């Protein structure tokens, strides 16, 4: 058997045994050329997007490390410190669910160090880099269209409570209140409902200085009264935006989302159960 195999080897030329070697080398070279290269150098880290940002910021910090940072003896005020992107805002570009609070604090620390460089020694590269991490809320606030008084000097606002909704027109006057074309006392027989409507005005000591015209629908009497209260508070802010803080602290600018809990099957009410009987 071994003699037969030796005779077969003698019959096969040597070139036939070596022809595959150059093909393998060519194939390996082609694979090496077509290999996919990751876009980020930090591709194999736990959070590639965040590490890429940190590498760029730290490289910029090392580049300007010889420049003297500002040495301020007194504490900076809140207006001096820039408003960086919040954790949720930075997570959109910093790794989404992979971002950890420690990584975010690390980013803010480096941003603060870059911001601490003396403006006279800083350049456009630093400013452009920091601008990408600033909050855009200030620009958004400038684009918000503020409500204004109409040509008759009225402020219009809409308030809601439970299933009730109210549209209120507020104008300076002698304190007259009309609800769906009816007088204040005629529409709301309960004193607590009337007090709820006048509460925003009492917070500002402005009772009797504004006329209120309300169109309300849906829900019960108490829900309608609180919907009007919510609308009156929003209309007062249209008259003077500086009153927003006082009204917000009084709790009349925030809508009350509480609703009656629905009844469940097998229960007498939402949670009340029938008395348990052994037999």
UniProtKB/Swiss-Prot annotation:
Superkingdom of origin: Eukaryota
Subcellular location: Mitochondrion
GO biological process: translation
Keywords (A to Z) from UniProt: Mitochondrion, Ribonucleoprotein, Ribosomal protein, Transit peptide
Main location: mitochondrion
Coiled coil: none
Segments crossing the lipid bilayer: none
Any GO molecular function: structural constituent of ribosome
The keyword Calcium is annotated on this UniProt entry: no
Signal peptide, first to last residue: none
Record-linked Gene3D superfamilies: 3.30.230.10
GO CC annotation, single: mitochondrial small ribosomal subunit
Family: Belongs to the universal ribosomal protein uS9 family.
Name of the featured protein: Small ribosomal subunit protein uS9m
Organism: Eremothecium gossypii (strain ATCC 10895 / CBS 109.51 / FGSC 9923 / NRRL Y-1056) (Yeast)
Gene name for this UniProt entry: MRPS9
């Amino acid at each position: 058997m071994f003699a037969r195999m030796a005779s077969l080897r003698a019959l096969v030329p040597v070139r036939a045994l070596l022809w595959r070697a150059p093909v393998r080398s060519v194939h390996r070279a082609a694979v090496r050329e077509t290999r996919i290269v990751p876009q980020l150098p930090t591709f194999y880290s736990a959070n590639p997007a965040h590490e890429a940002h940190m590498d760029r910021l730290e490289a910029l910090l090392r580049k300007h490390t010889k420049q003297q940072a500002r040495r301020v003896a007194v504490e900076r005020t809140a207006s001096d410190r820039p408003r960086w992107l919040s954790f949720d805002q930075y997570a959109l570009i910093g790794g989404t669910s992979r971002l950890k609070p420690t990584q975010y604090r690390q980013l803010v620390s480096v941003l603060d160090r870059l911001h601490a460089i003396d403006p006279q020694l800083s350049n456009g590269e630093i400013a452009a880099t920091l601008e990408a991490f600033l909050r855009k809320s200030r620009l958004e606030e400038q684009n918000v269209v503020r409500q204004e008084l109409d040509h008759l000097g009225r402020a219009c606002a809409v308030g809601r409570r439970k299933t009730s909704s109210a549209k209120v027109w507020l104008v300076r006057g002698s304190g007259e209140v009309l609800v769906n074309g009816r007088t204040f006392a005629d529409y709301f027989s309960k004193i607590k409902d009337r007090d709820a409507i006048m509460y925003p005005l009492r917070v500002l000591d402005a009772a009797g200085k504004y006329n209120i015209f309300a169109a309300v629908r849906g829900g019960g009497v108490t829900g309608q009264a609180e919907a009007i209260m919510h609308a009156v508070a929003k209309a007062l802010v249209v008259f003077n935006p500086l009153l927003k803080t006082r009204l917000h602290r009084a709790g009349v600018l925030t809508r009350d989302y509480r609703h009656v809990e629905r009844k469940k099957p097998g229960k007498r009410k939402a949670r009340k159960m029938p008395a348990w009987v052994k037999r």
